[in-house]
Amino acid sequence: MSEASSAPVRRPFHRRRKTCPFSGANAPRIDYKDVRLLQRYISERGKIVPSRITAVSQKKQRELAQAIKRARFLGLLPYVVA
């Protein structure tokens, strides 16, 4: 007998598409003064986390990056974390 026929058959895994956390009726607004919200989208080293990880839409990712850069310029967020 062949060994391949005794192995269990795996079903393909269907990953559910994440929705953008900034779209919807009661979604938070992206504001450069809201440091607590912006820190959720910055890595522990201070880099902006990509949208493929955070599931933020392309339009909102650009707004988020602009708000983070503005907050960095004003000294509300660090550029790098040592």
UniProtKB/Swiss-Prot annotation:
Subunit structure: Part of the 30S ribosomal subunit. Forms a tight heterodimer with protein bS6.
Keywords from the UniProt entry: Ribonucleoprotein, Ribosomal protein, RNA-binding, rRNA-binding
Pfam families the UniProt entry points to: Ribosomal_S18 (PF01084)
HAMAP family for this protein: Ribosomal_bS18
NCBIfam families according to UniProt: S18 (TIGR00165)
Highest taxon above the source species: Bacteria
Region (Disordered): 1-20
GO cellular component: cytosolic small ribosomal subunit
Protein name: Small ribosomal subunit protein bS18
Record keyword Phosphoprotein present: no
Family designation: Belongs to the bacterial ribosomal protein bS18 family.
One GO process term, biological-process aspect: translation
Molecular functions (GO terms): small ribosomal subunit rRNA binding; structural constituent of ribosome
SUPFAM superfamilies the record matches: Ribosomal protein S18
Biological role: Binds as a heterodimer with protein bS6 to the central domain of the 16S rRNA, where it helps stabilize the platform of the 30S subunit.
